[in-house]
Amino acid sequence: MIDLLIIAGPTAVGKTDISIKLAEKLNGEIISADSMQIYKYMDIGSAKITKDEMKGIPHHLIDVVEPHEEFNVSSFKALAEKSIKDIWNRGKLPIIAGGTGLYINSLIYNYDFTDADRDEKYREYLTKLAEDKGKEYVHSLLKDIDKESYEKLYPNDLKRVVRALEVYKITGKSISEYTKENEKKLYDIPYNVNYFILNMNREVLYERINKRVDIMMGKGLIEEVKKLESMGYTPDMQSMKGIGYKEVLFYLNGDISLDEAIYLIKKGSRNYAKRQLTWFRKDKRSIWIDKDKYRSEEEIVDKIIKMVKDK
């Protein structure tokens, strides 16, 4: 089984430095789990690690797609799994570092991103049937094939009724049976996972976020966005909707002032950190590291290494 070390946490908490120190001590390579750092040319706004900051540690899944290209959790999972195997086969430790919770979950839970359990034509047929004969009629179709769903769901909850009928058509099983089977498979992964979440005092974190935004502006975020625009990248692209990029675009378009743009970037980043922490708290497999309780990053690194070895 492959050992997999994960260092996650909210934006600006200091994941980069900790993960590099761990990679140095554990002979590891880092796989980025960041939904913005995958894009080329978007360096400042994504707080992308520089060559110097890498300190010679190989990094994967950074600068892998153009800003106009589609990239989703399924794309990440495929590339990350390939990198994990490659790193492990070369006798090194794969270290996942990042704050995109869904990306991380795609690796530590056995999510199926295929459409094997979907039938769009059947869904369309049932939706049309509900329009023609009524939602009650479609709901009644569950009675003989999935009594539990029939009794639990209301006719007005058409989306879930359709899903239950779809699952039965494809699998021959009730949706509750199907869900239980999938839950058993959820933990069937080829990794021995050590999952750590870095956290710190909320006010201190927010100060770090605000300071980071000021640093980004000083490094030339506005010029970076101008360059992206000149290359043909537009506001409707997923990449350009990222925090920092959309606000600067509003400013360049004359919709808001520069001060308003900076304020909105800081606010958006703080809110994002809050959402990240809420997401990570849901995962019972993770170990939380409160950075405020340690005197140095070296102490944190040593603590993580000890917990991994004692497991």
UniProtKB/Swiss-Prot annotation:
A GO MF term: tRNA dimethylallyltransferase activity
Superkingdom as given in the UniProt entry: Bacteria
The reaction(s) this protein catalyses: adenosine(37) in tRNA + dimethylallyl diphosphate = N(6)-dimethylallyladenosine(37) in tRNA + diphosphate
Residues spanning the signal sequence: none
Annotated InterPro entries: Dimethylallyltransferase (IPR039657), IPT (IPR018022), P-loop_NTPase (IPR027417)
Residues covered by region (Interaction with substrate tRNA): 34-37
EC primary class: transferase
Residues involved in substrate binding: T11, A12, V13, G14, K15, T16
Pfam families hit by this protein: IPPT
Cofactor: Mg(2+)
Site positions for Interaction with substrate tRNA: T100, R123
Residues the entry annotates as binding ATP: G9, P10, T11, A12, V13, G14, K15, T16
Gene3D superfamilies to which the protein is assigned, alphabetical: 1.10.20.140, P-loop containing nucleotide triphosphate hydrolases
Membership in a protein family: Belongs to the IPP transferase family.
Role, per record: Catalyzes the transfer of a dimethylallyl group onto the adenine at position 37 in tRNAs that read codons beginning with uridine, leading to the formation of N6-(dimethylallyl)adenosine (i(6)A).
Subunit relationships: Monomer.
Listed name of the protein: tRNA dimethylallyltransferase
Species per Swiss-Prot/TrEMBL record: Clostridium botulinum (strain Hall / ATCC 3502 / NCTC 13319 / Type A)
Originating gene: miaA
